[in-house]
Amino acid sequence: MDDHKPIETPDGPAVDTPGIGARRYETPPTELPITEAEAARAAGLAHNEHLKIASGYLRGGLADGLLKHATGAISEDDGQLVKFHGMYMQDDRDIRAERTKKKLEKAYSFMIRLRIAGGVVTPKQWLILDNIATTYAGSALRATTRQTFQYHGVIKSNLKRTMAAIDSALLDTIAACGDVNRNVMAATNPAQAGAHKIALQLAKDISDTLLPKTGAWREIWLDGERVVGGEDAAEVEPVYGKTYLPRKFKTVVAVPPSNEVDIFAHDLGFIAILDKKNRVTGWNVTVGGGMGMTHGEADTFPRTADVLGFVQPEDALKAAEAVMTVQRDWGNRKNRKNARLKYTIERFGLDAFRAEVEKRIGKKLGAPKPFTFDGNGDRYGWVEGDDGRHHLTLYVPSGRIKDIEGGPQFLSGLRRIAEVHEGDFRLTGNQNVIIANVPAGKRAEIDALVDEYGLTRGASALRRNSMACVALPTCGLALAESERYLPDLLSELEESLARHGLQDEPITIRSTGCPNGCARPFISEIGLVGRGPERYHLYLGAAFDGSRLSKLYREDVTASEITGTLDPLFAAYAKDRQPGEHFGDFVIRAGFVAKTSNGPDFHERTGPLRAA
C-alpha cells in the first residue's frame, strides 16, 4: 500500500505536495456553519446551503409537489431536497429528443435508493423488495456499488406507495443520498464469520448514530403525523443542525485481507485489526478518500484515504461522529465541487484534522496498526465460514437483478431461493449477491435452484473483476454509455487477453459514464470514464487492492479504439511481467504510465510515457 501521509516540515504543516509544490496549509476555521438562510446568501454560500437551512429540516415543498398531478416532475429545489429522502429525479434520455420534438414533458421518473447498512436483508425482506420491483420498477432491482438496492423508473404517482411498501419491510431510504452520511458498507467475507459480524454491527451502529433525526421522511411519504408539532424551531438535528453536511459523506468498514468495500475510496473507513484467532482488537481509521472530479478542472481530483490512527473498539463510534462533525464545520460550503472531506484535508492538513478529531473524541488516537489487503474483488462460488455455515456468491453483471431473455433469470431465481432460504442475503460492494448462512443440509436445494434459473456462480477473470455504473438512459449526469456498453467491451477484451494467454489473469476494469466515479474507476487497473457519446478517458496503473489511484493514459478514446489501445499492453504484460505482478503495477514498472502518489498528483504527467 502506498504511503498517503503528508510530509511534515520543522516549521509547521507546510508540505511538498506532489503536483502542487511546497505550500502551507490554511488555518482551520473557528466559526460554526451559518444557520440563517439570508446570512448564507449574503456570505456567498452555495445555493444548496440556504436551501437546506430554509427547508424545515428537509421538508421544503415536497408534500405539495406530490399533489401536482399535471406534471411528473417536482421543482428544481425539491429535486435537491428529495435526495436526502433517498431519491433522484430522472428522465428517460433515450426518448428525450423525441418528446421535446412533440412538445411533451420529459418522461420523468425517480430512482429510489435504500439504506441497508452492511447490505444484509432477510428472505422475507427480499420477497417484499422483489414485489416492489415487479409492481413499480419495471421488474428490475439493482444492486449498487455501495451495498444497497436501487429502483429505477418509479413514477411520481407511485412514490408514496413504493415508500409504504419499503417501510413494510422494516427498511427505509433516509439518507441514502444527499449531504449526509450515506449507506454504510461493511465487509462481506464469508470465511470470517466472527469478524464480519462485528464489522456489520459497527456499520449498523454508525448508520444509526449518524442518521438524520428529522421526521420529514415519515411525515411526507407515509402520511405520518409531524413528530414535533408547532414551529420548526422545536425540531432539532443534534448532529447535523440545519445545515447538514457540505457534501455527501461515505463510510465503510473493512476486514483484511479483503478490501471489497474499497476503503481508500471513501470519506471515512474503519479497518479491522485482527489477532491470530481473527478476533477484532480495534480499528485503524481512514479519512479523506473520494472518487468524483470534473473534467478539465485540475482543482478537482480523486483521492485515496489517509490512515488517521487507531482506536479501541469502544471509541469507534466517537471517532466516526468526530470525523463527520469536523467535516461539517470545516468543509467548503461555497463551492460544492471542492466540498468533500478529501478537499478539507488537502486545505487544512492531516495533522490539524487529526488534532481536531482527537479534541472531539477526548483522547489521542493510537499509531496505525499494520494490515494487508490482497485485492478488492469478491470470492465466487461456495465458501464455508469459520462458523460452519455456507455462503454462495453469485456473479450479477452490473448488479442488474432482472430476468434476461435467453439468459439468467435473476429476479425469478432469487425469488424462488428467498422462498426456501433459511439464512440471509448479502450484497457486495462489487454489485454481486451472496446467498449467505446456508445450513450444510440446504446446499443441494440452493444449487438446484441456481441451476434451474441459470444463475451465474462466476464468469471470466475479467468479468468477475468488472463494474459499471448505470449511466444512460436514466442518469442525468452521464456523458457516455456504461452499463449497456461494458458487456460488449468485455467480450472484445476477453479475446485479446486469450490471445496472449492471460484469460485467467484477474484484472480490475470499471466503467462510468461521467467523472463522478460511482463505480470507482480511478482505483481500477483499467478505468473508463465517459467524455461524450462513445468517447472515454482511459486510465491505467491503479493498485489491484484499491490502494493507489490510476493515471490518465489516453484522452478521448473512442469505443472502437479501446481494445486496440490495450492489446499491445496485454502483449507486453504477458511477455515481461514478473511472478505475481498485477497489471496495474506492471504498466508503471514497465514505464508505460506514471505512478500517481495521491490526489493532487492525479493530473500530473498524464499520457503514455512510451509506446507499447
Curated annotation (Swiss-Prot):
Catalytic activity: hydrogen sulfide + 3 NADP(+) + 3 H2O = sulfite + 3 NADPH + 4 H(+)
Cellular component terms (Gene Ontology): sulfite reductase complex (NADPH)
Positions annotated to bind [4Fe-4S] cluster: 469, 475, 514, 518
Manner of cofactor binding, per the entry note: Binds 1 siroheme per subunit. Binds 1 [4Fe-4S] cluster per subunit.
Source organism superkingdom: Bacteria
Protein's pathway: Sulfur metabolism; hydrogen sulfide biosynthesis; hydrogen sulfide from sulfite (NADPH route): step 1/1
One GO BP: sulfate assimilation
SUPFAM superfamilies reported for this sequence: Nitrite and sulphite reductase 4Fe-4S domain-like, Nitrite/Sulfite reductase N-terminal domain-like
Protein keywords: 4Fe-4S, Amino-acid biosynthesis, Cysteine biosynthesis, Heme, Iron, Iron-sulfur, Metal-binding, NADP, Oxidoreductase
Entry's Gene Ontology molecular function annotations: 4 iron, 4 sulfur cluster binding; heme binding; metal ion binding; NADP binding; sulfite reductase (ferredoxin) activity; sulfite reductase (NADPH) activity
Membrane-crossing segments per the record: none
Any single Pfam family the record assigns to this protein: NIR_SIR_ferr
Binding, siroheme: 518
Region (Disordered): 1-26
Cofactor(s) named in the record: siroheme; [4Fe-4S] cluster
EC number: 1.8.1.2
Quaternary structure and partners: Alpha(8)-beta(8). The alpha component is a flavoprotein, the beta component is a hemoprotein.
Biological role stated in the UniProt entry: Component of the sulfite reductase complex that catalyzes the 6-electron reduction of sulfite to sulfide. This is one of several activities required for the biosynthesis of L-cysteine from sulfate.
Family to which the UniProt record says this protein belongs: Belongs to the nitrite and sulfite reductase 4Fe-4S domain family.
NCBIfam families attached to this UniProt entry: CysI (TIGR02041), PRK13504.1 (NF010029)
Protein name: Sulfite reductase [NADPH] hemoprotein beta-component
Organism per entry: Methylorubrum extorquens (strain CM4 / NCIMB 13688)
